Amino acid sequence: MERITVTLGERSYPITIAAGLFSDPTSFWPLKAGEQAMLVTNQTLAPLYLDTLCARLEGAGVIVDRVILPDGEQYKTLAVMDQVFSALLAKPHGRDTTLIALGGGVIGDLTGFAAASYQRGVRFIQVPTTLLSQVDSSVGGKTAVNHPLGKNMIGAFYQPAAVVVDLDCLDTLPARELSSGLAEVIKYGIILDGDFFSWLEKNLDALLALDGTAMSRCIRRCCELKAEVVAADEHEHGLRALLNLGHTYGHAIEAHMGYGNWLHGEAVAAGMVMAARTAERLGQFNPQDTDRIISLLQRAGLPVKGPESMTAEEYLPHMMRDKKVLAGEMRLVLPLEIGRAELRRGVAHDIVLASIRDCQ
């Protein structure tokens, strides 16, 4: 069992990583016997895990209710989140309840925002079931829903009480979702840890085969890096923005193509190549390193080009609605070398457009 702490003073919390955690109710600390909880999941995961997890928690004396939401990025909306509020109020659940987010990034983000909003804030626990959510979205307290004009535009910073990563969940993960998660894994190597990137180049086949030892090490390192960044810059005033490598371009793809048509990791993968090409055009990134990024993404089964049906000009309106835009000026996360990146402002739009065209 691996345990990492996200250090935020009184709001610090553990990330527990191991196989078989669903069989151990103590993994869900700080939940205790006699307390009330609402377990939020989706229609795909409910048949796989819901009854087992509820039975374990109820066996430990926790009073568990449940709400099952539709599955997909297109359902990460205020309207769907209202189903969680309705379920909480119907019982009813008070301020001492705990929301449990059992799912990937959509369930985690939506449930976290519901927890931040319900009766002005209740406790919640992240139980990520996809690789992407285990290494990224479940850690750090970013909660949100989408708007038709932009991804994650309505939300709050609200930290979980705990993150429970059961490695057994990856056994039921579709191959496309596994690849999507690997995009975020590769991102950490590009922006923060060149040695980790090299390790990924050597061990990617083991990760694709769901080798337990390799996967545990991979998830642990990603969570360590994310925890360090969040502890240093919880509200994304500087360092944490680097975690958005590829996201400004990628969110444009997701919004333009319709949420759910491109998985988040797929859009980020293409976006990271666009960011590398932008950095190349600015003379700050070695084309050979771009080739390493492209090679690793392709081996992971990820796209390295944007949608054929989307012109470069169609990216810009979405990119100008990005949350990193300040005073009407786009800010982009760009790599400097494998293992190091910067937040760059003032990049000319013609350079951005040319870099996108490089990836069409």
From Swiss-Prot:
One of its GO terms (biological process) is chorismate biosynthetic process. It is an enzyme of class 4 (lyase). NAD(+) binds at residues 71-76, 105-109, 129-130, 142, 151, 169-172. It catalyses: 7-phospho-2-dehydro-3-deoxy-D-arabino-heptonate = 3-dehydroquinate + phosphate. CDD domains: DHQS. It comes from the Bacteria. Keywords: Amino-acid biosynthesis, Aromatic amino acid biosynthesis, Cobalt, Cytoplasm, Lyase, Metal-binding, NAD, Nucleotide-binding, Zinc. Pathway: Metabolic intermediate biosynthesis; chorismate biosynthesis; chorismate from D-erythrose 4-phosphate and phosphoenolpyruvate: step 2/7. It is found in: Cytoplasm. One of its GO terms (molecular function) is 3-dehydroquinate synthase activity. Its EC number is 4.2.3.4. Catalyzes the conversion of 3-deoxy-D-arabino-heptulosonate 7-phosphate (DAHP) to dehydroquinate (DHQ). NCBIfam families: aroB. Belongs to the sugar phosphate cyclases superfamily. Dehydroquinate synthase family. This is 3-dehydroquinate synthase. It comes from Erwinia tasmaniensis (strain DSM 17950 / CFBP 7177 / CIP 109463 / NCPPB 4357 / Et1/99). The gene is aroB.
